[in-house]
Amino acid sequence: MNKSMLIFFTILFLTYIIEEKEALKVEDLPEPESYKRAKQLALKDAKGDKNAETIALNFLKQNRRDCMKNCKLVPTCALLSPECCPDKTDVCKKLAL
């Protein structure tokens, strides 16, 4: 019985790893134009400070990822992740993916 349980959980674990590897992630999606503009503004506001640039870009990436799950998280979710907002606003429909 222990051997069969070990085999079962090994197969279950391998299935999980394969599905996780094959799953489409936010980083795999093309960046919409509005997100590219937000990145440019963040870099412009950092004024050449590499630490500030890194923080700003990480903040944008995290907000984009979180907006995929909850479109009402921040008011700019429609701009950061227009392809995943559950209720399609006019702004979201006009944005390019």
From Swiss-Prot:
Signal peptide stretch: 1-23
GO molecular function: toxin activity
Subcellular location(s) of the protein: Secreted
Keyword Phosphoprotein: no
Keywords: Disulfide bond, Secreted, Signal, Toxin
Tissue: Expressed by the venom gland.
Lyase keyword on record: no
Main location: secreted
Cellular component terms (Gene Ontology): extracellular region
PTM section of the record: Contains 3 disulfide bonds.
Family affiliation: Belongs to the scoloptoxin-10 family.
Descriptive protein name: U-scoloptoxin(10)-Sa2a
Organism: Scolopendra alternans (Florida Keys giant centipede)
